[in-house]
């Protein structure tokens, strides 16, 4: 079935700024509010954490450039499925797309859990009525009615925006990105007035936090321990190419290729400022003693600043939820077009231009989130990280092979350094994947996380088997000049 025969078509409304806010907002989210204390604990101080995030950004830049080159050359929704299919065939394309769908889709219920956790744990201290009706406990975590309802209302709003179309979702993303930046500016201002560089001393120390402790014995080991976590906190730049088919007419594709790298660099700078600002407000060894230190330290300084930051932190998860919702639906759309998922996944709503079936499936997954409890955050985090990096690595190898098999393909943007730069992306991705699967590595998945991965793979193999005799749908990728 050709593109023209598809039911409906994607709206072409997204500008370079829209793409930047989609990626940047997906990357930063509010993980920094919940995790900045853990970064310092695991690294043995804010200095080690900052160095790790710098290295992490540099590590992922070649991968971001690979996405930029391929997306500018082949700007279609869920392009990862297309790239791998053209180089390594339908089976590997399916595996890559299926795992990336897992990695991205997980972030939707993850963010819903984060909202309910902040409402119950932090707002619950201010307004005990929020914890007055307990529904049940799961994995030792209590689930309360009112925080669940509030998280559901936030999630439903994001779902509605994505059903309305890419333009509405992009407008929401722009607002949320500005809100997150306001929160960071607030933290910076407080650190300048109340804190000082002497508070980041000692440069390295083993400390005990509310829920974790430093296991590294040296600063170098601390940097490595944080470094293996950074791919998850930089995950989100891939949401930019997933919606490339909805780029506005006349978009400069050379600049588009640079947007992904810019989003990574901006996020790296954001994390640097975040870690330094919170690490210097008060002595960092005191800062990390609270359960959510980024908020707890503000509560002792000024209750109004605390409430302001808490509000920003609570609406913040809507940003990555929005970005990953849109990205995952486009991945499933691409897989439907390839015949890798049921035909209904290839259908686009004629009015809103959004993938109908994928949106419905993601809506169900997202609203389940608040009912799972906060103890599911860590397993979902690690599974998402592995799925994301595996897909990025496959895209990097596809980019390299496409340079050999399709040398004449128009490439408005190219990876700096050519094949050498692409090789660096392949190496970086492979190394991170190995760190996550080799026994003994600080980032190795545990039994629960492996069960999620293997369960998802089993479901995927069943679907693949059911569809193995179906003819792949033909879809012609538009060139940049035709988009």
Question: What are these language model-derived features?
Answer:
Residues 5-10, 49-50, 129-146, 175-307:
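Helix-loop-helix junctions that connect adjacent transmembrane segments
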Residues 12-117, 231-232, 237-240, 245, ...:
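Transmembrane helix-boundary motif of multi-pass solute transporters/channels
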Residues 38, 61-155, 314-334, 378-390:
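Hydrophobic transmembrane alpha-helices that form the core helical bundles
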Residues 40-44, 48, 114-117, 123-124, ...:
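Transmembrane helix-loop boundary segments of multi-pass membrane transporters
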Residues 82-85, 89, 121-130, 207-214, ...:
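TM-loop-TM module centered on a large, flexible mid-protein loop between adjacent transmembrane helices
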Residues 146-197, 260, 264, 381-394, ...:
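Membrane-interface loop-to-helix entry segments
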Residues 344-353, 392-440:
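C-terminal membrane-solvent junction of multi-pass transporters and transport-like membrane proteins
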Residues 475-482:
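Conserved small/polar residues in nucleotide/adenosyl-binding loops
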């Amino acid at each position: 079935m050709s593109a023209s025969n598809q039911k409906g078509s994607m709206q072409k409304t997204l500008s370079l700024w829209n793409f930047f806010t989609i990626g940047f907002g997906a990357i930063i989210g509010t993980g920094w509010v919940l995790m900045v204390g853990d970064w310092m604990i695991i690294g043995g101080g804010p200095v080690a954490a900052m160095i790790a995030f710098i290295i992490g950004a540099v590590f992922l830049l070649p991968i971001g450039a690979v996405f930029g080159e391929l997306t500018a050359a082949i700007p279609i929704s869920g392009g990862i499925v297309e790239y791998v299919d053209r180089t390594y065939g339908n089976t590997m394309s399916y595996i890559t797309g299926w795992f990336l769908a897992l990695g991205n889709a997980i972030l939707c219920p993850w963010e819903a859990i984060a909202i309910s956790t902040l409402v119950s744990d932090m707002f619950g201290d201010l307004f005990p009525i929020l914890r007055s009706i307990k529904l049940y406990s799961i994995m030792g975590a209590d689930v309360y009615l009112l925080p669940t309802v509030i998280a559901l209302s936030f999630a439903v709003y994001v779902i509605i925006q994505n059903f309305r179309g890419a333009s509405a979702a992009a407008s929401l993303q722009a607002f949320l990105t500005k809100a997150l930046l306001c929160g960071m500016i607030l933290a910076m201002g407080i650190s300048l007035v109340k804190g000082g560089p002497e508070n980041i001393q000692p440069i390295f120390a083993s400390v005990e936090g509310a829920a974790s402790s430093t296991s590294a014995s040296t600063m170098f080991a601390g940097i490595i321990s944080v470094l293996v976590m950074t791919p998850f906190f930089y995950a989100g730049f891939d949401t930019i190419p997933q919606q490339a088919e909805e780029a506005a007419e006349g978009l400069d594709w050379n600049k588009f290729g640079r947007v992904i790298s810019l989003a990574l660099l901006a996020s790296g700078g954001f994390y640097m400022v975040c870690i330094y600002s919170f690490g210097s407000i008060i002595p960092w060894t005191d800062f990390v003693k609270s359960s959510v230190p980024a908020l707890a330290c503000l509560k002792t300084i000024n209750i109004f600043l605390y409430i302001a930051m808490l509000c920003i932190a609570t609406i913040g998860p809507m940003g990555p939820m929005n970005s990953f919702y849109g990205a995952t639906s486009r991945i499933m759309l691409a897989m439907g077009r390839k015949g890798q998922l049921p035909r209904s996944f290839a259908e686009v709503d004629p009015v809103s231009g959004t993938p109908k079936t994928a949106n419905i499936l993601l809506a169900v997954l997202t609203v389940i989130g608040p009912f799972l409890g906060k103890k599911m955050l860590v397993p979902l985090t690690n599974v998402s990280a592995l799925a994301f990096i595996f897909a990025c690595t496959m895209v990097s190898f596809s980019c390299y092979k496409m340079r050999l098999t399709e040398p004449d393909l128009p490439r408005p943007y190219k990876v700096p350094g050519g094949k050498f730069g692409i090789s660096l992306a392949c190496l970086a991705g492979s190394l991170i994947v190995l760190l996550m699967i080799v026994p003994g590595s600080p980032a190795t998945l545990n039994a629960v996380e492996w069960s999620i991965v293997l369960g998802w793979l089993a479901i995927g193999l069943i679907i693949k088997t059911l569809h193995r005799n179906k003819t792949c749908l033909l879809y012609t990728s538009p060139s940049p000049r035709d988009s």
